[in-house]
Amino acid sequence: MASRGGGQHQRHQQQQQQPGGYGRGGGGGRGRGRDGAPYSGGRGRGQDGSYPGGRGGGYGGGGGGGGPPYYGGGGGGGGGGGGQGRGYYDDGGDGRGYQRGMEGGGGRGGYRGDGDGGYGRGGGGYHGDGERGYGRGGGGGGGGGGGYRGDDEGRSSYGRARGGGGGGGGYHGDGEAGYGRGRGGRDYDGGRGGGGRRGGRGGGGSSYHQQPPPDLPQAPEPRLAAQYAREIDIAALRAQFKGLTTTTPGAASSQFPARPGFGAAGEECLVKVNHFFVGLKNDNFHHYDVAIAPDPVLKGLFRTIISKLVTERRHTDFGGRLPVYDGRANLYTAGELPFRSRELEVELSGSRKFKVAIRHVAPVSLQDLRMVMAGCPAGIPSQALQLLDIVLRDMVLAERNDMGYVAFGRSYFSPGLGSRELDKGIFAWKGFYQSCRVTQQGLSLNIDMSSTAFIEPGRVLNFVEKAIGRRITNAITVGYFLNNYGNELMRTLKGVKVEVTHRGNLRKKYRIAGFTEQSADVQTFTSSDGIKTVKEYFNKKYNLKLAFGYLPCLQVGSKERPNYLPMELCNIVPGQRYKNRLSPTQVSNLINITNDRPCDRESSIRQTVSSNQYNSTERADEFGIEVDSYPTTLKARVLKAPMLKYHDSGRVRVCTPEDGAWNMKDKKVVNGATIKSWACVNLCEGLDNRVVEAFCLQLVRTSKITGLDFANVSLPILKADPHNVKTDLPMRYQEACSWSRDNKIDLLLVVMTDDKNNASLYGDVKRICETEIGVLSQCCRAKQVYKERNVQYCANVALKINAKAGGRNSVFLNVEASLPVVSKSPTIIFGADVTHPGSFDESTPSIASVVASADWPEVTKYNSVVRMQASRKEIIQDLDSIVRELLNAFKRDSKMEPKQLIFYRDGVSEGQFQQVVESEIPEIEKAWKSLYAGKPRITFIVVQKRHHTRLFPNNYNDPRGMDGTGNVRPGTVVDTVICHPREFDFFLCSQAGIKGTSRPSHYHVLRDDNNFTADQLQSVTNNLCYLYTSCTRSVSIPPPVYYAHKLAFRARFYLTQVPVAGGDPGAAKFQWVLPEIKEEVKKSMFFC
């Protein structure tokens, strides 16, 4: 039940305003239970003196009640003995107050107030100082308590004081009346709204922007964004650009849907975002083309040449201008150079001379940038954003060279920011990412912390010893070295730059191409004075006696012109990123390093902005750029979790997730699958079959309790060799089938080791079961099998098995409310993803996977299609036939034809949006029209996880503004300030935090024939995240996207190379093949 303060809030929410004041809020409940609803006060029933208080109960009992701090209704202290409440803070009133008060009725009051009326319905905000505290008010009063140290005089104190009482401001406010029923007071968003921190109804006042929480370092007023906002007339800009088209050559105006409005559903809250406003005071920019001859061989030489040129010629040829350079062919200046075209000469050390030709191309137009910022249709202002990114890059690299930053794309790393070994000579360097973006508030600099793997610099032999895990001695022969370590070492070292140490200051650099097949003692080559061994050459020419001549040399030349260097004379050049796939151990260590708590990550980001000193650099002055030193603070909303329905035979039939999580206790799945016959294969060499059998019995019991029709164990546990799984597993399967009554089994349970490096074994098991045998499989980890009565793990396994076998775990209690628009008309929901091989693998194919819902209106079951396509091609090939297959499957399974289509597309960058619209959406339309009459109603949404926007709670001291991990609460959505000025996009953090800082997903609508409102699409997207079958938690992206990603990852295990006949004699040719998934498996959700 809402409190009286809550009623006030509801009226203001309809006006899209935040509740006013601290508000009066409801009192606590009488028994046990939970806190009241946020914002609306509510008569919640706390337990054991939780944050808001309860009304009674025994000593230490009753607690809770009221809403949370900020906006929620108040509530007295926790239950005390009888009527004397024992509360959370101190000095509350007697009875319902916080701690045992002094006199009067106390109760539902403010935040440690002691003004007229005290905690109770009287005055006193935070450290108020009115005369007559604690009681119920009344009397002549005196000076009322201030708000957060507010001290102006007014008519009514913070509480409900009926006497005179001085007024108090809100957060440092100074309005006429306080947070009580008085009128003034600068409160959280003004108005007479509902309760805040357990005060009265609250008077009006200014918005929250003017009263940031007092416990955080705040930006000085006015903020940089506010300064620029006052100087920019958006209406005038729109009028100016009306009818204009984009000025970017070859770019079309944005064809993506405009935002249909802003969302309003959910509880409002404040969040901080790692976006820093960028002010631009200059608009006279010019683009120059750069050509260097002879062409520098090394990539880093380009910047060295231009840097020296600028240093030498800035105040002569460049007329005092300080240009910025992209590292290849583009130079930008703030103002024109004194020439249109000129050729200049640069000489580097070693008498290396280069000619640099500079030619004026054109002024850099900012019109597209201004049009987008004004919310007008325009192309992506790519050139303007590129210019700003280059300026900001040079601010870091050129003016903070004391940090020794190494740049990769938009990320900058330095061991000075932190370095930790991952394993085997591979280190993680900490760094940061920065990128300039166009948002609703204007230009924004997105800064985030980042880490990546580097090869440890120093002696090659030291690295080799770490990599192989042993000391190098003369007991190691060249044959032993190459046979046992050669391939693994060369995967790591190939392409790595080394410098020689035997030539004094001349540290010439080379790239490793391979190892020699012979040791330095015997490896020969032809020199100017005949054939020599490497050992002889270095001994004679450099008077060096090799200590490790028994090891192979590094080959740093080509096949035509080999060049051999002893490993002991080479050092690995610092600052080289490790380019190969990390081992499972290295991945695990990297994850642990990067899993910073939200408060720590935010602190690191702010420290990065401070130490980079953007506004103090020469280039900031030159180009007229200002960067705010404080992160953006904005209003977000927390969407409610949907109510989930379970089977009526369970003790708990309806579940409301809390903080994005719930459990299966006393619940049964909505539709339990039937497992008639199954077998278990033990792939662990040291695991006794009796232990496995005990686990299987527990799994059967738990599955039955969960609602599955699961046959008892009837087959013996089968043992198989993990080193020969390709042969053993099919044999064990046939053996199990021969014992089964129907000569087939429905499920193969496979127990595997916990070795972090068993990914290949897992992949082999899935490939064999799904593309060769044709049986559903469920892998279980040995460490979980060892545990006795591991009910929770068995329950999770049962949920996966149920979904794979055709069951349904849960559904929405109210489908119409949970899936607006979708529930009105038969709808098919797609998820699609394309995964690519490793960064430096150019031959392995990419995998495209598409899943689509098979039921309506529940939307819990999915069909799937997976295809192989050309390496690194992001656009899905042959999407027409894929969609057609899934449309037919929907009709087969649901017995109805779809009327509308929602397509969630993962893995697409902003630069590929137009390509997707032009290539993939027409394929979807083509598939639809081949089956149904009329044009399809398509809503196409790109889902992005690989971005660097992070949301942080505004106040880490307020547990109501975050989940248990310190992250924003699940359901937090943002569609203002940092989002696109015109187009339909939003950030949604649908998942609860587990470890580290949660990453919100970014959704960008590229087409919307179904005319979703912002609230409808955000609600559908958030609610779908509660229907992921493999766990009882909300996930970070909608299930169809999640399944598509898992399926694409799974299919990579299927890929095989087969020889191709023909071609040159003796030349082995291979082609990649993606085996077909067996039909018995394909018709299920085997990818769960």
Curated annotation (Swiss-Prot):
* Superkingdom of the organism of origin: Eukaryota
Gene Ontology cellular-component terms listed = cytoplasm; nucleus
Occurrences of domain PAZ (ranges): 477-574
Q: Cite a single GO BP annotation.
A: regulatory ncRNA-mediated gene silencing
- Which residue stretches belong to region Disordered? 1-220
Q: What does this protein do?
A: Probably involved in the RNA silencing pathway. May bind to short RNAs such as microRNAs (miRNAs) or short interfering RNAs (siRNAs), and represses the translation of mRNAs which are complementary to them.
Q: Which family does it belong to?
A: Belongs to the argonaute family. Ago subfamily.
Q: Which PANTHER family match?
A: EUKARYOTIC TRANSLATION INITIATION FACTOR 2C
What name does UniProt use for this protein?
Protein argonaute 18
Instruction: Give the originating organism.
Output: Oryza sativa subsp. japonica (Rice)
